[in-house]
A protein has these predicted regions:
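Iron-sulfur-associated redox domains of electron-transfer enzymes in respiratory
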Residues: 1-79, 84, 217-507
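Short flexible coil/turn linkers enriched for glycine and charged/polar residues
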Residues: 111-114, 127, 158, 204, ...
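Residue-level recognition of alpha-helix initiation/capping sites
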Residues: 124, 155, 171, 201, ...
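Gly-rich Lys/Arg/Thr-decorated short loops/hinges at beta-loop-alpha junctions or inter-strand turns
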Residues: 108-116, 139-148, 187, 205, ...
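N-terminal [4Fe-4S]-dependent radical SAM core
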Residues: 89-118, 135-136
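Short sequence/structural segments immediately N-terminal
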Residues: 87, 95, 155, 175
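Iron-sulfur cluster-binding cysteine motifs and their immediate structural context
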Residues: 126-151, 159-196, 201, 205-220, ...
Length: 507
């Protein structure tokens, strides 16, 4: 639903804005404010969306807790919304797993999957639906002449739906489960959505595909602002997918000016880290494939790499050991600014999971999504479209580095680095987007179908510009990123001034 302003986006934006306002108003009691906010966000005597004002406020209360980085509470728990706030009210606090949470009393308990005959059935003479059903689950209502499905016999194959000339048979799936490429969502004893965290890779696709807004992730909005207010030098590292996310008129120069207005010490585009990553992966590919590894898979998408290691542990070594663009950018910032604290701002929920790794925690201090950033801008009344542009922009990455955010961009960047130094080197590439496709790609690779290949995997259908923390329509984002990438003065990743820093960063 990216690019469509729904009630869910409206509520999320209000919550992010209010959490940011709490952080800025140090004179307020955070505990008291937390208890009062559900009444501000859902005012009056009547619910706006569910016709139950108490339920709506309870849901907002849990959303507030998660936005503060606090654990989700079940409806059975009796405790204040602000319970545990003392731990969250510190800029060094980092949330604990799980990152993605189902607010059970917000869940609609949608059917997992069912095949349903609608009123569109015309009771035709042919009844092809009956003929193709492998379980004889479809019969004829002699009164109306319309088809009826015996749900006890139905195996949900959908063949009947595919042959209906009137499209009168539909296959309904729970939206969150359908979006989950890891098959990590099932039903609990009450029919509510339940996440299997042994399978979940925190891509966040369930979050953006739930029409009831019952799934939410944790945030560091509050802690980031408090770090800035404490006087620390906080640097923003903005992911390549940022173009257009804050409005069609918001240029990189305006974004930089807006970030500086919030108190950030400086702003860098993570595309410079993407350039470094492409160079490192190119060197590793030339060194290891095919002599040491049968194939090499890219490393920049954390949900993809975690999935690969969960499901194909025997081929874990085939996932590139190159540092991700986020980590490389953070290291670069801290190498030149030892006292810096780094905030990664991007499209991705899984980057929050990556930043929780022990090896990354010292590099990346906070992770925010583009959507969460809009709440911070709103809280400080920063008008991004009309702010005076900073001519410095956000740095000078290559075209290939900026194209990391779109399908095929990562692999192409690596190939271009290799081709620049080894023009006769053949590099075969295969890529997949969406975890279902990624799983199939890796399965085929482990069976020997992609010998000597460079594999690019991206967990989100539509790649980074379609991440869980984005707001702009996906096609529009793809176009925006492509146009911005073409403006770079460097084509390939190995041409940028930052490449000379790589050896220092990966030692």
């Amino acid at each position: 639903m990216r690019g469509v302003e729904t009630r869910i986006q409206e509520i999320r934006h209000k919550i992010f804005t209010e959490v940011a306002r709490m952080a800025y108003h140090t004179e307020w009691s955070v505990k008291d404010r937390m208890e009062a906010l559900p009444y501000k966000i859902i005012p009056g005597e009547k619910g706006n969306f569910r016709n139950d004002v108490f339920l709506e406020r309870a849901i907002v209360g849990e959303r507030l807790r998660l936005a503060m980085g606090l654990p989700y509470r079940s409806a059975a728990e009796h405790s204040p919304i602000s319970d545990g706030i003392e731990a969250a009210d510190k800029d060094e606090t980092y949330y604990t797993p799980p990152l993605i949470n189902v607010i059970k009393f917000a869940c609609n308990a949608c059917p997992e999957k069912r095949v349903h005959v609608t009123d569109g059935c015309q009771g035709c003479l042919a009844h092809p639906c009956m003929e193709v059903c492998p379980k004889d689950a479809i019969s004829l209502d002699r009164t109306t002449g319309k088809s009826v499905i015996d749900q006890e016999k139905c195996i949900k194959c959908g063949r009947c739906a595919s042959v209906c000339s009137y499209n009168a048979i539909i296959v309904q799936e729970r939206p969150c489960a359908k979006a989950c490429g890891m098959d990590a969502i099932s039903s609990d004893e009450n029919g509510k959505a339940n996440i299997d965290y042994d399978k979940c890779v925190s891509c966040g696709q369930c979050l953006v595909n739930c029409p009831f807004g019952a799934i939410a992730d944790k945030s560091q909005i509050f802690q980031t602002i408090r770090a800035i207010q404490s006087g620390e030098k906080v640097y923003a590292a903005v992911a390549p997918a940022f173009v257009g996310q804050f409005g069609p008129k918001v240029t990189p120069g305006k974004l930089r000016a807006a970030m500086k207005a919030l108190g950030f010490a400086d702003v860098f585009e993570v595309a410079i880290g993407a350039d470094l990553c492409a160079k490192q992966e190119a060197e590793d590919f030339l060194k290891e494939v095919p002599d040491e590894l049968p194939f090499m898979a890219t490393s920049c998408c954390p949900a993809w790499s975690v999935m690969a290691k969960k499901l194909f542990p025997e081929h874990a070594k085939c996932i590139s050991m190159a540092l991700t663009p986020m980590t490389l950018t953070a290291r670069l910032i801290k190498q030149h600014n030892p006292d810096a604290r780094v905030v990664f701002i991007g499209p991705c929920a899984a980057k929050k999971l990556e930043a929780m790794r022990r090896s990354v925690r010292s590099e990346v201090d906070f992770v925010l999504t583009f959507e969460e950033m809009t709440g911070i801008f709103s809280a400080k009344h920063v008008d991004l479209e009309n702010i005076k542009e900073d001519p410095a922009g956000v740095s000078d990455a290559s075209t290939d580095g900026r194209n990391f955010a779109v399908a095929g961009g990562v692999a192409q960047a690596v190939v271009n680095v290799i081709k620049r130094d080894h023009p006769d080197q053949e590099v075969k590439v295969a890529n997949a987007e969406g975890l279902k496709e990624c799983r199939q790609l890796l399965k085929l690779a482990t069976l020997g179908k992609y010998p000597g290949y460079l594999l690019e995997g991206m967990a989100c259908p539509g790649v980074c510009v379609a991440g869980a923390g984005t707001m702009q329509a996906i096609k529009k984002s793809q176009t925006s990123v492509g146009l911005y990438a073409k403006q770079s003065t460097h084509k390939t990743s190995s041409e940028t001034e930052y490449i000379k820093e790589l050896d220092k960063l990966v030692d």
